[in-house]
């Protein structure tokens, strides 16, 4: 590898002696050399045109166009090799990172700028040289496709009695372990290798087992059924609708009003907390939420309000603006008074008013639920191991015991 790399750099053109490398250079006078033993050619034209024809070093040194090029100095070759090899190794490493990024979505060694650079190169390649795709229609009608799917279901259906007792959506069967689990292990636990390793499959099965066991323990503790991802999907849909300024459907509106879904409650509480921090003197924690533009706006607004009035009077911008409007002659509107009265009455008469907890109490409650979940998780593992050992112990003597089913004593 070292000899090949040395030959590679030896055949490269010599380094540039000028700020740029013009494709065409014209010299208006002949070159003279004072080196001893130099014999000028018989005829040297007064105007010599040289073109960068990408020849190797040997052919360039023997051509007549090499009059304007300094002779190659081999003493500089180690320095060039060292500098060029650094960039060569960096390019190879970067290409390997790109391959790992596209193969297994590994971005651990890539910076955001590098990812943006990779995506830019990909977009440029797609735009300049798009790939032509031929679409072949396999089915003439939907009925043909349905018949094909029915035939595949019969051919690739249940293979044994254990799977025949289970439903189609049940993953606790050998077909899921043999088909779907290797793909999951190849994607997340194989380290970017081409061939699936046995350790990767075992690690994927272990992690999935722990995840399912913990979800079961958490569901029993929190008294919530196991489809826990439904809550996250509902929160994602709610957040998407809010970002798009779309109309909320009735089911999401009822979910928001019921306050039974913690993720939706956190979204609403976050928005209200940001408003309190911005305009009601709640603090400066909004710096972690706002972008640079809005952060500068809010800071400028607070500085201007503090310049107009003392900090004690302008901390709550709502009250300060209401006071200024009242001094200017504005009468409070009937709807504003009704809103304050209604909100106060709801806060007092609400059946959940006595359930208001402080932040410390909420944290202690969450910690208690997590401890209970871990306790149930540990007991599940103990019971599972005990039952598995009992089944193995019971199956050992039954292997040699004759079948007496149907006989009477």
From Swiss-Prot:
Glycosylated residues in this chain: 128
Q: What is its main location?
A: virion
The Gene Ontology terms for molecular function here are: structural molecule activity
The protein's UniProt keywords, in alphabetical order, are: Glycoprotein, Host nucleus, Late protein, Virion
Q: How is it modified after translation?
A: O-glycosylated; by N-acetylglucosamine at one or more locations.
Magnesium keyword on record: no
Localization annotation: Virion; Host nucleus
> Is Disulfide bond one of the keywords UniProt gives this record?
no
**Record region (Leucine zipper 2 (LZ2)):** 367-380
Q: List the disulfide bonds.
A: none
Q: Which InterPro entries is this protein grouped with?
A: Baculovirus_Gp41 (IPR006790)
Q: Where is this region: Leucine zipper 1 (LZ1)?
A: 201-214
Read off the Pfam families from this record: Baculo_gp41
State a GO cellular component annotated for this protein.
host cell nucleus
Q: How does it assemble?
A: Homooligomer. Homotrimer. Forms oligomers in infected cells, while selectively assembles as trimers into progeny virions.
The family assignment reads: Belongs to the baculoviridae gp41 family.
Function of the molecule: Major tegument protein that participates in the egress of nucleocapsids from the host nucleus. May be involved in host nucleus-cytoplasm transportation of nucleocapsids to form budded virion (BVs).
Can you say what this protein is called? Structural glycoprotein gp41
List the source organism. Answer: Autographa californica nuclear polyhedrosis virus (AcMNPV)
């Amino acid at each position: 590898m070292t000899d090949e790399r040395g030959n590679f750099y030896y055949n490269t053109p010599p380094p540039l002696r000028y700020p740029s490398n013009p494709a065409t250079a014209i010299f208006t006078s002949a070159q003279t050399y004072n080196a001893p033993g130099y014999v000028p050619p018989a005829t040297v034209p007064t105007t010599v045109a040289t073109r960068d024809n990408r020849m190797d070093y040997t052919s360039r040194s023997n051509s007549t166009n090499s009059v304007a090029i300094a002779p190659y100095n081999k003493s500089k070759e180690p320095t060039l090799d060292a500098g060029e090899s650094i960039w060569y190794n960096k390019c190879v490493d970067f290409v390997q990172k790109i391959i790992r990024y596209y193969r297994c979505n590994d971005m651990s060694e890539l910076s955001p700028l590098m990812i943006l650079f990779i995506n830019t190169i990909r977009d440029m390649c797609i735009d300049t040289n798009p790939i032509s795709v031929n679409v072949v229609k396999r089915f003439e009608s939907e009925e043909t496709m349905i018949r094909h799917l029915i035939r595949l279901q019969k051919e690739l259906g249940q293979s044994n009695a254990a799977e025949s007792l289970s439903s189609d959506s049940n993953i606790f069967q050998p077909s899921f372990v043999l088909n779907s689990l290797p793909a999951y292990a190849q994607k997340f636990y194989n380290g970017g290798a081409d061939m699936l390793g046995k350790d990767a499959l075992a690690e994927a099965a272990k992690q999935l087992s722990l995840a399912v066991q913990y979800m079961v323990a958490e569901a029993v503790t929190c008294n919530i059924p196991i489809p826990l991802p439904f809550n996250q999907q509902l929160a994602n849909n709610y957040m998407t609708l809010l970002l798009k300024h779309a109309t909320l459907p009735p089911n999401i509106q009822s979910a928001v009003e019921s306050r039974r879904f913690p993720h939706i409650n956190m979204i609403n509480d976050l928005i209200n907390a940001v408003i309190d921090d911005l305009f009601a003197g709640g603090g400066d924690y909004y710096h972690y939420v706002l972008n640079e533009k809005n952060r500068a706006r809010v800071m400028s607004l607070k500085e201007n309000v503090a310049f107009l009035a003392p900090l004690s009077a302008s901390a709550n911008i709502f009250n300060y603006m209401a006071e200024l409007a009242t001094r200017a002659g504005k009468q409070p509107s009937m709807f504003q008074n009704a809103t304050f009265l209604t909100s106060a009455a709801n806060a007092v008469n609400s059946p959940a008013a006595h359930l208001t907890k402080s932040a410390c109490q909420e944290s202690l409650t969450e910690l208690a639920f997590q401890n209970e979940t871990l306790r149930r998780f540990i007991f599940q593992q103990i019971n599972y191991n005990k039952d598995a050992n009992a089944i193995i112990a019971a199956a050992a003597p039954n292997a040699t015991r004759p079948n007496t089913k149907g006989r009477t004593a």
